[in-house]
Amino acid sequence: MLTKAEALAHTVIYRKNSRFDKVKEKSEELTLIGKGRSAYVFALTEGGRKMALKVFFPEYQATAVKEAAIYEKLAGSAFYPDIYETGDSFILMEYIKGETFYNCLKKGIAISDDMIQQVEEALSDARAAGLNPSDIHLRNLILTETGAVRVIDVARFEQTKTCTQWDDLKSAYHALYKKPIFPKKIPGFWLEIIAFLYKKDWFQKHFAQRKRKYS
């Protein structure tokens, strides 16, 4: 007999050739709250408790199993969501109410030294669990209503190559964001352009050229 989470996960049917709106069918009990490269996340309420159901695309079922195992290793850390149930294609987890760092920048919610330090502690917990924190970006860091920072989307925490993404974000925070003249509210359009240029290594190449020019 299927658990409720399994049954609800099975109601989610994705369109195969759609990039932005992949949900073809789903239970009315599920509300779409997040979109990612390998899965969509839905909110559901059971017994008065709100939870998040992450349902992976069929081609990413192996990622579901991998991410569930990583969350199990992180179970002792307060910086990651509690996991209630896992399956071949889904993870049922704690619903974290708050704003992503991405939305903080869009809305002008201040990012503080304490928030940066909490991310550092979260990644330190992951390393202590034998993991290699990777693919840390503004959308998987959440500031809760109590001021706590939580980290989600940990599927790449077992990759072996070095990922400098968090170090680059931290450097930008100290070198740019903390400057009094730097805007604390940035339109999403510009955030997307910055992310695109970063992925294309534009900033890395540009600053490397400047360094060579003035060295």
UniProtKB/Swiss-Prot annotation:
Its EC number is 2.7.11.1. It catalyses: L-seryl-[protein] + ATP = O-phospho-L-seryl-[protein] + ADP + H(+); L-threonyl-[protein] + ATP = O-phospho-L-threonyl-[protein] + ADP + H(+). This is Putative serine/threonine-protein kinase YrzF. One of its GO terms (molecular function) is ATP binding. Residues 27-215 form the Protein kinase domain. Belongs to the protein kinase superfamily. Ser/Thr protein kinase family. The keyword RNA-binding does not apply. ATP binds at residues 33-41, 54. It comes from Bacillus subtilis (strain 168). Keywords: ATP-binding, Kinase, Nucleotide-binding, Serine/threonine-protein kinase, Transferase. Gene3D superfamilies: Transferase(Phosphotransferase) domain 1 (1.10.510.10). The active site is at 135 (proton acceptor). Transmembrane segments: none annotated. It holds the Pfam family APH. The lineage of its organism: Bacteria, Bacillati, Bacillota, Bacilli, Bacillales. InterPro entries: Aminoglycoside_PTrfase, Kinase-like_dom_sf, Meiotic_Drive_Suppr_Kinase, Protein_kinase_ATP_BS.
